[in-house]
Regions:
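Short, well-ordered turn and helix-capping elements at secondary-structure junctions
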Residues: 38, 56-58, 76
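ATP/adenylate-binding site constellation spanning eukaryotic-like Ser/Thr protein kinases
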Residues: 46, 57, 66
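Short, surface-exposed charged micro-motifs
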Residues: 51, 58-62
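Conserved short-loop catalytic and cofactor-binding motifs
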Residues: 15, 49, 76
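Negatively charged, low-complexity tracts enriched in Asp/Glu with abundant Ser/Thr
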Residues: 2-45
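A short, surface-exposed loop/turn module that caps and links secondary-structure elements
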Residues: 28-54, 99-108
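Short coil/turn residues that cap or connect secondary-structure elements
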Residues: 19, 53-56, 80
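Enriched for short, Lys/Arg-rich terminal
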Residues: 2-5, 62-113
Length: 113
């Protein structure tokens, strides 16, 4: 199975930092699973937009097969689920540009190492 590189958006990382350590650890475990299983979680209308649920939370991520990357972009509770999904869909082009930039920066760091 293809191995993916998982990235977190700045807004996602800032939001996760507000949660207690238990929630942060669960997010880390989901991230670890995504490296080897891009189909982890539930599809949200397409195979490249998915969510993973635990307790009352949903983690949203975008899969970029052509880039070999997964981008974790949001967390929400059940009651904000549809609003969050709609917002992510509005910003798909922005997320694509952001992940491409992160990958370029990551590749530069790898070359310097």
């Amino acid at each position: 199975m293809k191995e993916y590189k998982v990235f977190r958006s700045i807004s996602f990382q800032e939001e996760i930092a507000k949660y207690d350590k238990n929630i942060q650890d669960r997010v880390d475990k989901i991230e670890d699973k995504l490296i080897y299983n891009s189909e982890y979680g539930n599809p949200l209308g397409t195979k490249w937009f998915r969510e993973s649920r635990f307790e009352n939370y949903r983690i949203y991520y975008l899969i970029y097969e052509d880039l070999g990357a997964i981008y974790m972009v949001a967390i929400s509770g059940k009651k904000d689920q549809q609003k969050t999904i709609n917002t992510i869909r509005l910003f798909l082009e922005f997320f694509r540009e952001e992940i491409e930039k992160l990958i370029r920066e990551d590749n530069l760091q790898d070359e310097e190492s």
